[in-house]
Amino acid sequence: MWKGLERDENTEIQSSNESYIDDYNHYYICFFNPIIINGCLAKLLSFDSQRTEVYKDTDITHYQWYIGKNAKKEYADKWGMDESIFPESITDNMDVLDYKMVYYNPWDAQYLSYLVVEYDDKSYEEEIQRLEQYDSKEYKGYFGTRGFRDKYRLLAIEVDPDHGLIYALEEENNQIIYVELIFCNYFYDIDYQDEIDIQYLPIGFDATPDNEYHQKRLNQ
């Protein structure tokens, strides 16, 4: 009887030791195998990206939360780009016809905004003058951009070769369209074409992840 009991106890000890070894091997593989570490990290990044929501706001009364010197912290510095092409604030002489702000930040912040304003005659001329005095940058070739549609006249444009474009377009009926397309490292992670009227986008503009401009910059 005692011998049988000894065999049972030894079996339990052996089983316990085997379990310990299995646990050790498991943790060794998880923490010290680079391939598995990279795989786990990739899954973690993917999971975090999926949990990050695209934030959108179309309420014009929130305009100064996102644009100008009084913008909230996460919108105050958009990769160092100068967004003074946009109006500093919304005033009584502006009839806002359309507005949208999109923000996405899974790891690197991305912004898309547009504002369509109809001005009275006097204010329209003043705004045209302000924008024409802006130190506009050469933009063709960046992100595939070739120009703008014939119905618009480009009034001012800011360009960053890594982070995007900010510009203003003149349309008929005293209307001006302001657009900012700001992202990190040559492309958007959002479906930006679903967020803005494509008529407002430059001809040839491509900020999808596999865009040709992105590939050229990586190969430089």
Each model region followed by its residue ranges:
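Cytosolic-side transmembrane helix boundary signature
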Residues: M1-Y24
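Acidic/proline-rich low-complexity IDRs
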Residues: G4, C40-L44, V96, L154, ...
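Polar low-complexity intrinsically disordered regions enriched in Ser/Thr and small residues
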Residues: R7, A71, E83, G144-G147
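Hydrophobic membrane-insertion alpha-helices, especially the h-region
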Residues: Y20-G39, K43
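N-terminal export/targeting and maturation segments
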Residues: I35-Y119, S123
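Extracytoplasmic electrostatic interaction patches
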Residues: E127-Q220
